[in-house]
Regions:
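Active-site-proximal cap/loop segments of hydrolase catalytic domains
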Residues: 479, 486-677
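Cap/lid segment of the alpha/beta-hydrolase catalytic domain
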Residues: 241-242, 295-296, 401, 409-531, ...
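Residue-level detector of Asp-centered blade-edge/turn motifs that repeat once per structural unit
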Residues: 46-47, 99-100, 155-156, 229-230, ...
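Short loop/turn segments that connect beta-strands within beta-propeller blades
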Residues: 74-77, 132-136, 206-210, 256-261, ...
């Protein structure tokens, strides 16, 4: 079957619209998940006039997530200026502009046809493709047999740095799959499965000739490649310790771009025992900014900080030591006067900036919003992907005063939908610790009206936060008549390291008190009906749900998604052996700690009707513990149900499964919560 070509549409295309009355508004439905599109990967053109971005759609007919590349003018503040660049069927990602602005490149796995670059099995592999802005069909720049994992343009536009995974030395002749031979300490990863010993290395690709030169090698992986401004060097991230599986000790390294065959070995810039990542060069090429974790022994509870290191060598300088908040995605301003970065704080994700000497911290983009990505234009304009309580992610610009929206991807859908009211609240926990959360109420709910059936929804992590980001699930529950309470309990990020670390080796205690305090606040406020309560979550949200229903019978229904209840059973079964050992110790030495924390050992206390869900190839939080919880509850005669999604890892991907999960959420809560007990 012929495939539609990928074509750059002419920039002279025009649109017209006929003024119409706004459609009557209706409540949000499950099917709106497939009407709403996800915007991501904003990339500013070198001339600062355009932003390219990826729009992703969940397609129920094909049961796949599909993506398209779009472009919008940055001087536009109205709908209608955005231009689609790719036809369906390619799902591009990682868009990048060539330095001269002539090409817009992206990663894609093209189906069979010209440029497919299949491997020895005949399967197409991911390659770098390029669109010429002057028009014409996209063409593949690379033809790497094993595919390309990541890439970046050199400053002169003549080369690309590619991240490419090794290939097996000998092909497998058997008709059945090759046996998995395990020798590594870390031998599983969610989304991948069993790990082999193949590694990902860096190559320099010359665009004009197609020449490919390997510049790193060895028994370790390289990632996050970043060209120096003069194009002579490439910074990257790698864990080159004696056993990278036994730690998270990634460092920042620099290698010469012409280091063919390892002739010029990489040079190590950082020696921190924790993770160092996300390198970004200063405009003069003398320094590299990066994200660092200086307390590896407390794993993901540690605060991620901003640091700066001289390329010539010397001790790094921590720029945000006193900030006590997680940061990310650092980028130098074009003139080198400031470093911009993402900043997580109290249910917001702002965009902040700081001087290279660590002074003058400001937050240009802040407020009730969640900024998840940004790029800086040549004229100083900040171009950001921003979500708000009533706006799924869209691209905005900031020129020094206020945010201005430049994409309107979902406006036509949202115009016909009544959304929930969202309120940020603060309340005391049992020990008087102030806790924050968000309460969603149905669109037609009036203050002072009768209390509502209410759902406590718990976030994953545990080190993450509910924010002002558009929350489809909470909006859906509110559209079906529920109040929804979302809490940032201790263990969450956004409130400092001590707040996150408060649940270290103590899950289900302080965080239990905090989420229950959120429910009690909603009851005191007249929002929640204490006789009609439900609880649930996914990942750590499911884990804490299990603790909740062991400790209380206040909830009429529970949904435990991708959860753990018998922690010792997961050692060596999930992909967290390093984290388990750090937090709880080796299970044969500290078994009492493992058993004390596991809700399974008090499973007889559970009387709440419980829906248990998970994916059958989830190696993050394997379905095994869900099966054990289900088996125990069925043996005890409790009301329960187990739903297993075939072929799914930790985050469900198939649109049909996403739809099914939402429908089961609603059906379970409607069955047990809406009728007073």
């Amino acid at each position: 079957m012929p495939h539609a070509p990928v074509v750059l549409l002419l920039l002279t295309a025009t649109t017209s619209a006929v003024a119409q009355a706004p459609p009557p508004q209706r409540p949000l439905t499950v099917d709106d998940l497939f009407a709403l599109k996800q915007v991501g990967n904003p990339q500013v053109s070198p001339d600062g006039r355009w932003v390219a971005y990826v729009v992703r759609t969940l397609n129920l007919k094909t049961d796949r997530s599909e993506a398209a590349l779009w472009m919008a003018p940055l001087d536009s503040g109205t709908a209608g200026g955005a231009i689609p660049l790719t036809a369906p069927g390619y799902s591009p990602s990682e868009a990048r502009w060539s330095p001269d602005g002539r090409y817009l490149s992206f990663l894609a796995t093209r189906p069979r046809g010209p440029g497919a670059a299949p491997d020895s099995t005949g399967e197409p592999k991911t390659q770098v493709w390029a669109l010429d802005r002057r028009g014409g069909e996209a063409r593949p720049l690379t033809h790497v047999p094993q595919g390309v994992d990541a890439y970046e343009w050199s400053p002169d536009g003549a080369r690309l740095v590619l991240a490419i995974r090794d290939t097996l030395a000998a092909p497998w002749a058997g008709k059945s799959p090759r046996p998995k031979v395990i020798t590594r300490l870390q031998f599983k990863r969610d989304g991948t499965g069993y790990l082999d010993t193949l590694r990902t290395h860096l190559y320099v690709f010359t665009v004009a000739s197609g020449a490919l030169t390997q510049i790193t090698s060895g028994t370790y992986d390289e990632s996050d490649p970043a060209w120096s401004p003069d194009g002579h060097s490439i910074a990257f991230v790698s864990d080159r310790s004696s056993d990278p599986d036994a730690n998270h000790n990634t460092d920042i390294w620099v290698v010469a771009a012409d280091s063919a065959g390892g002739a010029r070995p990489p040079r190590q810039l950082t020696t921190n025992p924790g993770s160092d990542e996300s390198p970004g060069w200063s405009p003069d090429g003398k320094s590299i900014v990066y994200i660092t974790d200086v307390e590896p022994d407390i794993i993901y509870y540690a605060t991620r900080q901003l640091a700066l290191v001289s390329v010539a060598g010397g001790a790094p300088r921590l720029l945000t030591r006193t900030l006590d908040r997680n940061v990310g995605d650092p980028q130098f301003a074009r003139d080198g006067s400031a470093i911009w970065f993402l900043l997580e704080d109290h249910g917001e994700q702002d965009i902040a900036r700081i001087a290279p000497d660590g002074s003058g911290l400001t937050r240009p983009i802040t407020g009730p919003l969640d900024a998840s990505a940004f790029r800086l234009a040549p004229n100083g304009l900040a171009v950001a992907l921003v979500s708000k309580a009533d706006v799924p992610g869209e691209i905005f610009t900031w020129s020094g005063t206020a945010l201005r929206q430049v994409t309107f991807t979902n406006d036509s859908v949202l115009a016909g939908i009544r959304l929930a009211r969202v309120e940020k609240v603060t309340f005391p926990s049992q020990d008087r610790t102030p806790i924050e959360g968000f309460i969603f109420t149905p669109p037609d709910h009036q203050r002072g009206a009768a209390p509502l059936p209410t759902l406590l929804r718990i976030h994953g992590g545990p080190v993450s936060q509910y924010s002002w980001r558009f929350n489809f699930e909470a909006q859906l529950f509110a559209a079906h008549g529920y109040a929804v309470v979302t809490v940032n309990p201790r263990g969450s990020s956004g409130y400092g390291e001590a707040f996150s670390r408060a649940i270290w080796a103590d899950w289900g205690n302080k965080d239990y008190d905090d989420v229950m305090a959120g429910v009690d606040y909603a009851i005191r406020s007249g929002i929640a009906d204490p006789r009609r309560l439900g609880v649930g979550g996914w990942s750590y949200g499911g884990i804490l749900t299990d603790h909740v229903i062991v400790k209380t019978s206040r909830f009429a229904a529970a949904i435990s998604g991708a959860s753990e209840v018998l922690y010792i059973a997961n050692y060596g079964h999930d992909h967290y052996q390093y984290e388990w050992e750090k937090e709880l110790g080796l299970p044969w030495r500290t078994r009492a700690v493992w058993e004390r924390l596991s809700p399974f050992n008090q499973v007889e206390r559970i009387v709440t009707p419980t829906l248990i869900m998970g994916g059958d190839v989830d190696w993050n939080v394997p379905i095994q513990n869900g099966e054990q919880l289900y088996q125990a509850l069925r043996r005890l005669g409790r009301t329960t149900e187990l739903v297993v999604y075939p072929g799914e890892s930790h985050g469900l991907r198939a649109p049909s499964h996403l739809k099914d999960r939402l429908e089961r959420y609603l059906a379970w809560y409607d069955r047990f919560v809406k009728a007073p007990r």
